[in-house]
């Protein structure tokens, strides 16, 4: 039904995650420098009226791009290290409010419409980790959608003493062979140079769900397109 309601951050795991947090924090300073220094070089050369060759300009642009991706990846890894370890105190939260908040934080493109059926249910957990969970799952759907517009459907129901949530989109979907791998940190189905994504979002989602004693998985869907992600969370007041 569910695993014990515990934190993943214990013993050696806690030490490893503290190291990850410190390491990513320090590396982010280097990544920001890598993003800024090419601009300084360009400004200095412009002040001296030096015109860069096309190849040199492309190389500087490439350096900025890779530095930006590195910074995004380090930010995502920092968020992963914070789950459970730096969590807010557990409390009861209105599921509809959590989902609506995540929907408002989605990027403007693609334009996704959120349909919610939360049934007035409440869940128990740290607010910051629950926000990370819904941002990760809904954000993953937006990041990989292949159209300018689409739909997200979030349905919740009671399940024993817990609340089961299913998030479905109408994007391109994922082949069943990859349904497990996508929850691993830094996992992407295409090269990061093509997608621009860190591959950490669903790893964050899995860590939050497991820290709250649940499980998360991709489930089969009868729709011709799309993906459905299902997970369970501790209910509040008997799940309602």
Task: Map each language-model feature to its residues.
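Conserved DHp (HisKA) dimerization/phosphotransfer helix of two-component histidine kinases, i.e.
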Residues: 54-108
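Short conserved segment of the HATPase_c
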Residues: 174-186
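Detector for a conserved hydrophobic position within an alpha-helical segment of the HATPase_c
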Residues: 209-210
């Amino acid at each position: 039904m569910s695993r014990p309601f515990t934190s993943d951050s214990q013993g050696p795991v806690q030490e490893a995650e503290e190291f990850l947090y410190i390491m990513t924090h320090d590396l982010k300073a280097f990544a920001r420098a890598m993003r800024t220094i090419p601009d300084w070089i360009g400004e200095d050369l412009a002040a001296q009226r030096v015109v860069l060759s096309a190849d040199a300009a492309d190389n500087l642009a490439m350096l900025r791009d890779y530095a930006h991706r590195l910074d995004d990846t380090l930010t995502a890894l920092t968020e992963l290290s914070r789950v459970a370890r730096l969590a807010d105190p557990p409390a009861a939260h209105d599921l509809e409010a959590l989902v609506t908040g995540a929907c408002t934080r989605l990027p403007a493109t693609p334009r996704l419409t959120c349909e919610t059926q939360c049934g007035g249910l409440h869940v128990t957990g740290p607010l910051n980790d629950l926000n990370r969970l819904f941002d990760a799952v809904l954000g993953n759907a937006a990041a990989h959608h292949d159209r300018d517009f689409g739909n997200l459907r979030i349905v919740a129901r009671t399940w024993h003493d817990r609340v089961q949530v299913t998030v479905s989109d109408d994007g391109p979907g994922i082949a069943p062979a990859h349904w497990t791998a996508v929850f691993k940190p830094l996992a992407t189905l295409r090269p990061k140079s093509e997608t621009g994504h860190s591959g950490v979002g669903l790893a964050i989602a899995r860590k939050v769900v497991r820290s709250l004693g649940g499980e998360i998985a991709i489930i089969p869907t009868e729709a011709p397109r799309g993906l459905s992600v299902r997970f369970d969370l501790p209910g509040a007041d008997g799940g309602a």
